[in-house]
Amino acid sequence: MTNPVSRREFLNLLGAYGGTSAVLQAGVALGFMPSSSQAAEITLQANNGKKVAILGTGISALTTAWELTKAGYGCTLLEASHRPGGRMFTVRSGTVIDEIGNYQRCEWDNDPHLYFNAGAARIPSIHSNVLKYCKELEVELQVFVNESKTAWVQDDAMNGGKPVRNTDYSSSMQGFISEMLSKALGDSQLDSSLTESESEILLSMLRRFGDLNEDMLYKGSTRAGYGSGGFLDHGTKKDVVALRDLLKARNGGSVMVTTQEGTGSGPLLMQPVGGMDRIIYAFANRLRDRIKFRAPVTEVMVKDDGVEVAYEQNGVTEVLKADYCFNCIPSHLMSGIPNNFPTDYSEALNYIRRGRAYKAAFQAKERFWEKENIYGGITWVNAPIQQIWYPPHNIHGKKGVVLAAYNFGGANYTEMSQEDRIEDLLKHGEKVHPNYREMAEKPMTIAWHRMNHMLGCAPRWARDRGGWSDKEEQMYETLRQPVNGRHYLIGDQSTQHSAWMESAIQSAHYALADLDQRVRSEPA
């Protein structure tokens, strides 16, 4: 008899082969996870006189405060920083990047179109709770172009280091893969698994998918555009980059699937007009009287009948007493703040690691990418900068802000001076755009693992790339339960799909539902 596979093991295996998109879709289909296809309806018991302390002003904290305030709870939010939002952070003229050892103030032109989303930057259409709050709070949205086939793929080892258009790369890879699979249909093992009719159907699909010729060979495709002509004159196909050369691009897998699949991907996503922090300030402006800024928490004590939170503001230590506490302080920071949490809870808090994402951006003197027929999307570079993003808004304007680096594990940038960081992004960027260095004005960089009050970005639970261990699963479940029924940990750190606003919001909804059940069960 075979050993049964647990839910977690099943999702781990699925994730190893299909990525987070497959995990979430299967989890929803099998009832392991809530569907995000519909936004949650939050109904809380109203006007019960309860007081709630909310630690931090990330999107989970603001969601919590908004829903509780609408229900008549008394809420106080404590924020260590001078601004709300945590990792939902937009840089524009005058913005301070409070990175330890690399303080920067943005000096870009004071223009509403010139901004850089240094943290969260994209909203998929299936992130229904994010979209629900945008609608409720009247945050205007616009299209975010996640993929442009006219953007570039560059690797020093491919094509002599010369960049290749995304469309050339992806069309050719589709063609070569289709050609190889069509040849494999003659293999006895594969052929035996298909009927003659099924083989014919598959061959027809492969011919169309890869744009193969009558001999089922890939000889180039007009899908990649024409080398010349195509409108008034007959078009001629572009020269084909050989498969062996294409395979030298070590970021090819990202080019082929990152903007096509996944809960955070797709060619077309959304963003708020004017920057991602428009969502944050839509909440914060409505909760302004309840937020205390520059008020770092110094102690959290859970009592039988409530929670006491000590914090400092203006050099004075204050104590906030509340019936309940919702806490989105990053776990690795919270573990260093004096508290009386149970041992297993503290162990779980201290276990979660943090990502080290790095981003950089500059104001461009001209929208030079538009002269290359690029309007949004991502260029992939096999270098530490990894990605270049082009702004999809303010098309044909004078200037724009280019995201010049996005490295998910940017610890190597910590050791660099600001000058060296800038030189690194320029030298790799000019391999794609020869006038890159000339066009770049006033670059800004941000290493999230050095940001004050954050010291990291998205939480990382699993130590093993193959999935979660039983111990990690147990620690995760421990943090999802409120300490003494009074203290709730919220944010993407208490979800299985970190780094997304939708996850953080759903964590708040989960905790709010638990709170409401407890409040309703209390004796009158």
What kind of feature is each model-predicted range?
Residues 1-21:
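N-terminal secretory signal peptides and thylakoid transit peptides that target proteins
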Residues 13, 22, 31, 71, ...:
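Conserved flavin/dinucleotide-binding core of flavoenzymes
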Residues 42-180:
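N-terminal glycine-rich phosphate/pyrophosphate-binding loop and immediately adjacent elements
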Residues 59, 85, 134, 283, ...:
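Generic structural signal for small/hydrophobic residues in well-ordered secondary structure
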Residues 150, 157, 181-296, 304-306, ...:
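Active-site/ligand-binding neighborhood in enzyme catalytic cores
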